[in-house]
Amino acid sequence: MGFSVFTPTRSLDGVSGFFQGAFLLSLFLVLFKAVQFYLRRQWLLKALEKFPSTPSHWLWGHDLKDREFQQVLTWVEKFPGACLQWLSGSKTRVLLYDPDYVKVVLGRSDPKASGIYQFLAPWIGYGLLLLNGKKWFQHRRMLTPAFHYGILKPYVKIMADSVNIMLDKWEKLDDQDHPLEIFHYVSLMTLDTVMKCAFSHQGSVQLDVNSRSYTKAVEDLNNLTFFRVRSAFYGNSIIYNMSSDGRLSRRACQIAHEHTDGVIKMRKAQLQNEEELQKARKKRHLDFLDILLFAKMEDGKSLSDEDLRAEVDTFMFEGHDTTASGISWVFYALATHPEHQERCREEVQSILGDGTSVTWDHLDQIPYTTMCIKEALRLYPPVPSVSRELSSPVTFPDGRSIPKGITTTILIYGLHHNPSYWPNPKVFDPSRFSPDSPRHSHAYLPFSGGARNCIGKQFAMNELKVAVALTLLRFELLPDPTRIPVPMARLVLKSKNGIHLRLKKLR
């Protein structure tokens, strides 16, 4: 009986002691993290004191939301060369927008910034974009032949076919005078192109109602990944996976992976046919996916399923979304500068007449159109920034230095709007790219630069030329004055309110 009388008291004392211990441990951990946060921030302030910065919140940093580009352009004019941007917590990055600074960083072999790019891994895996070191070099060397001019030449006709499908859809619209949000159409068109060129897809995804689910998943992942990078709490995978954003991200990843898995499965099935297999093996240059399927690594083994899907996911995203962004912004730039649009149209007509076919040789015969495309990519670079994590200290030409471990972000948008290298940077002036106009080798980087530049830059540039040439033959592009696009910082440059144009049929 005595035991039963005292047990509840002892039990309560035990529970109370447990909670006291848990509270003290939690308090210790909070204090430890607070001290760690303070010391890290003080170290960063000292180490990067030569890089100016505007006042920021101690926890949220420079919370720019969707005003990032407006603020960045202010910094570019106010702080020559580079400046400091505080993100959430003790995270910071040095923004570089001077060609001399950019040249130094791109001339090194620093890895991609893990604190930023790691959040892409659940989506695109470790393909060319995220790989570093020896494995990156092996994959880059393996995939470079997929962009040999011998491969790219026949792609021009495929690109033209995809563009014409999009233009046919535009011609069938009931109300030609009503502004159209063009990015949706352009995104499906570039996806159609990359599916046919790189993945031997038959048919057209532009005519497949289910294809919209993939482009919508990519759009969602663009936004969700960007928000996660900027969040003070979503860096923790447990917290992120429990959040509504985490659940949306997993669902979008599932949709994207189902799409790419289907592409791989379909091509593998085609290669089970002996005739198709022999046809592929006899090619002088293999397509992108066939290179991956036939690849042998240095150990003699085939590419793992994980590596295979990572490269397919990476190129499926980069091969269509960045190009769709570029084409959409070029269309907008031409719509708002009708005199340049008309000059491009006249140039294209002089080469193609009223035809709908474009050849490889035609692409070098439209210099003014090419100048306009390049100027639009200067104003609206599809990838607004790239980041590196310094593997060793770096010193710039003016003597300022950054220690190992710091993230440097090459702010391509700021670089392209730097008034020290681009007079009147907000003005659309294609003559900047005339053959006799000199410029710094690293002042213009729409496809990044250095050893890790965009492997598909020639593919993308060809597609831009084909899309612009064929569109100008069939439509006059007019702006919607009620909805002026607002550039928005994401993984790929987007507009906060879409890109709306009026399309006037020419024939």
UniProtKB/Swiss-Prot annotation:
Residue spans crossing the bilayer: none
Result, substituting residue 318 to A: Loss of covalent heme binding
InterPro entries, A to Z: Cyt_P450 (IPR001128), Cyt_P450_CS (IPR017972), Cyt_P450_E_grp-I (IPR002401), Cyt_P450_sf (IPR036396), Cytochrome_P450_Monoox (IPR050196)
Enzyme class (EC, first level): oxidoreductase
Principal location listed in the UniProt entry: endoplasmic reticulum
Keywords on record: Endoplasmic reticulum, Heme, Iron, Membrane, Metal-binding, Microsome, Monooxygenase, NADP, Oxidoreductase, Phosphoprotein
Pathway terms, separated by semicolons: Lipid metabolism; fatty acid metabolism
UniProt record, GO biological process: arachidonate metabolic process; icosanoid biosynthetic process; kidney development; lauric acid metabolic process; linoleic acid metabolic process; response to 3-methylcholanthrene
In-chain residues carrying the UniProt-annotated modification Phosphoserine: 437
Localisation per UniProt entry: Endoplasmic reticulum membrane; Microsome membrane
Protein name per Swiss-Prot or TrEMBL: Cytochrome P450 4A14
GO molecular function: alkane 1-monooxygenase activity; arachidonate monooxygenase activity; heme binding; iron ion binding; long-chain fatty acid omega-hydroxylase activity
GO cellular component, one term: intracellular membrane-bounded organelle
Induction: By clofibrate.
Binding site for heme: 318, 454
Keyword NADP: yes
CDD domains with a match to the protein in the record: CYP4B-like (cd20678)
Organism the protein comes from: Rattus norvegicus (Rat)
The keyword Oxidoreductase belongs to this UniProt entry's keyword annotation: yes
Chain residues in the propeptide: 1-4
EC number: 1.14.14.80
Cofactor: heme
